[in-house]
Design a protein with these regions (language model features):
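Short, glycine/acidic-enriched loop or turn micro-motifs at the edges of active sites
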Residues: 32, 160, 244-246, 263, ...
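Active-site activation/catalytic loop segments of kinase-like enzymes and analogous catalytic loops
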Residues: 273-313, 327-346
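Amphipathic alpha-helical interaction surfaces in cytosolic regulatory modules
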Residues: 3-76
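ATP/Mg2+ or Mg2+-diphosphate-binding catalytic cores
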Residues: 316, 331-378
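Conserved N-terminal boundary motif of the eukaryotic protein kinase catalytic domain
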Residues: 84-92
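ATP-binding pocket architecture of kinase catalytic cores
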Residues: 91-92, 98-197
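An alpha-helical support segment within catalytic cores of ATP-dependent transferases
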Residues: 191-242, 246, 252, 370-372
Length: 378
């Protein structure tokens, strides 16, 4: 956009904006812009002053450099164009609730998110991965946000490792060894205090919002019951993964590493363990496709892991803690539907059809158990 066309472009934009009526936010897609002059810069400055929620997206590197060098990136929202990656369907490594993972190169993988996933959700995952890394948790190095066709993706280093699920499948005789490592990973994480004022979110607040979001699928009575359970969990400041099933732990040498960091938060360990139990023991959906091993193995590894996690406690106390964890899992079995608006309708219906049996018919028991949550101090 040089001086010869800037005036004409400004006139066209102004005439279009007049037809729009009240404008709350204005976004300029600059994907076709290869050059911008001082007149073009002044035009964007005028737009940013006229529309407080003004942003420019898909800016090519050379143009972004101009915006950056002139200080415009400090006074308005300007986003670089994302690097485009192409993937081979045959390079698929795994699939989770909100994305599919592919090998991108000899050194990297890319997690491709479902259609409908927002840039904010993608940025949150890469931010949480970096925050957990800084706090001392073993995680893959995260590189960049990319595009794969029309979808967003995250590029990570390729770990020369196997998922914990794969290790258990291949060596079930080492179940106790793997369970101990799994428990150590939880304990390592739950010993980390998350400092106030950082970017890691409050897991309790997020879980409450997720349950309230279910009002589109469940009636008010059902939502209130789930809220009653969740809001009974004590507050906490410990680092939580919130989706640490065995397919989200990678065995690299003798060390387990965390992947899939989109739900990282802080709070009470009961939230984290309840989420994991809902995947490892009571998952709805295709268990082997999601967890990566038979349900029988999942139950075995959970029972052994929780015994190691609470090592030194009496069998009665471990059973009590497991009952508390199971109560929280009854909510997570359904609240995870809020992670995406594009889950298959058949899966949504399966969840709804199981709700009465799993939750409503056990209402009194679940509420009674939730009243004991306060005895779990950290």
């Amino acid at each position: 956009m040089d001086s010869s066309v800037a005036a004409e472009v400004k006139e066209k934009i102004s005439s279009q904006l007049v037809l729009c009526g009240r404008i709350n936010s204005l976004t300029c897609d600059a994907s076709g812009l290869t050059y911008i002059s001082s007149m073009g810069l002044r035009m964007t400055l005028q737009l940013s002053k006229s529309y407080p929620n003004f942003s420019i997206i898909e800016v090519q590197p050379d143009v972004y450099h101009v915006f950056d060098m002139t200080g415009f990136t400090k006074i308005m929202a300007i986003e670089k164009a994302l690097r485009q990656l192409s993937i081979d369907e045959n390079s698929k490594i795994g699939e989770g609730g909100i994305g599919v993972v592919y090998r991108a190169s000899d050194d990297s993988i890319v997690k491709v998110f479902r259609e409908g996933t927002t840039m904010d959700q993608v940025r949150n995952e890469i931010t949480m991965a970096k925050e957990a890394f800084v706090l001392g948790m073993p995680t893959p190095i995260s590189f960049d946000v990319v595009r794969v066709g029309s979808r967003y993706g995250l590029e990570y280093e390729l770990l020369h490792a196997e998922t914990l699920s794969t290790c258990i499948n291949q060596h079930p005789e080492r179940m106790d060894e793997y369970a101990r490592k799994y428990a150590q990973l939880f304990r390592q994480m739950h010993h980390i205090h998350v400092p106030k004022g950082g970017s890691i979110p409050d897991s309790m607040a997020r879980e409450e919002a997720a349950v309230r979001h279910l009002s589109r699928n469940f009636d008010a009575k059902s939502v209130d019951l789930m809220l009653g359970i969740i809001l009974s969990i004590p507050k906490g400041d410990r680092l939580l993964h919130c989706d640490l099933q065995t397919k989200n732990a990678m065995m690299m040498g003798d060390e387990l590493m965390l992947i899939d960091m989109g739900e990282v938060g802080y709070g009470h360990p009961l939230i984290d363990l309840g989420h994991a139990y809902s995947a490892m023991v009571t998952l709805l959906g295709d268990y082997e496709a999601i967890v990566g091993m038979p349900r029988e193995y999942g139950k075995q590894i959970w029972d052994k892991m929780i015994a190691h996690y609470f090592e030194g406690e009496s069998p009665e106390m471990i059973a009590h803690r497991n009952e508390q964890i199971a109560a929280v899992s009854c909510v997570r079995n359904f609240s995870w539907l809020s992670l995406s608006d594009s889950f298959p309708e058949a899966l949504v219906q399966e969840c709804k059809s199981n709700f009465d049996e799993r939750v409503m018919k056990r209402r009194d028991h679940l509420l009674a158990v939730s009243k004991t949550f306060d005895d779990w101090t950290v």
